[in-house]
Amino acid sequence: MTEYTFDDLAVVMGTYNEEQAIGSVLADIDRITDGRAEVVCVDGSDDRTPEIARKMGARVIEQEPQGYGVAVEAAVLAPDRPVVVTTDCDDTYPMEYLPKFLDLINDGYDVVSGDRITKGAETMPRLNRAGNIAFARLASFLMGATVHDTTTGMRAYRRELLHDIEWTENTGLSAELLIRPAMRGYNIAEVPIPYRERAGETKLDPFAGGAAIGKSIVKVCLEERLRL
């Protein structure tokens, strides 16, 4: 089995008006990977986010704002490198876990998913935390297998998996990116990670967004059940 290094790693994200945080996120990726990882940002911003990202060496794909999932799907399918890590651009996720995620891919896992809930996620707004716990319980019930965090933005994937599955969701894409591989028998590892307070304002309405995510979880789980 091929032993992947940071030269085989792409870190991707959808970005939208994150000029307060993007520099810190990209600096962390560069520091942790010694500048060897490719960074891809699919961007729909009207602030300085794409300018900052380009100056820091990221590949920026500009896109009209069409929602979280449209941007992230474009981001995960863009790299040619064999290991793709998703993250958010709001500085909430610990880039120091990139080596551990890569090690687990090298151990044979197809998806490595950062679990924010197990460590407590005290910096997460209370309503968001309650919703994320509820989403994980709903998905676990419908899948017939326990998952702890279906909506985390930090995961590592084998590239071929991302191209072998057809993705259909927008707001609920993060949950779909875990549920479909899990229900198709891919090897999944969940890794408890710390979660930092976000830099800048959230763009997601917790009620409308939460309803869309819940609907996606039910839809995707039922579709995967019907495939079996």
Curated annotation (Swiss-Prot):
Its EC number is 2.4.1.-. Disruption phenotype: Cells do not generate the small monosaccharide-charged dolichol phosphate species. SUPFAM superfamilies: Nucleotide-diphospho-sugar transferases (SSF53448). The keyword DNA repair does not apply. Keywords: Glycosyltransferase, Transferase. One of its GO terms (molecular function) is glycosyltransferase activity. It is an enzyme of class 2 (transferase). The keyword Plastid does not apply. Glycosyltransferase that adds a monosaccharide to dolichol phosphate, thereby being responsible for generating one of the three monosaccharide-modified dolichol phosphates. The subunit onto which additional sugars are added is not known. PANTHER family: RFBJ PROTEIN, UNDECAPRENYL-PHOSPHATE 4-DEOXY-4-FORMAMIDO-L-ARABINOSE TRANSFERASE-RELATED. Belongs to the glycosyltransferase 2 family. This is Dolichyl-phosphate hexose transferase HVO_1613. It comes from Haloferax volcanii (strain ATCC 29605 / DSM 3757 / JCM 8879 / NBRC 14742 / NCIMB 2012 / VKM B-1768 / DS2) (Halobacterium volcanii).
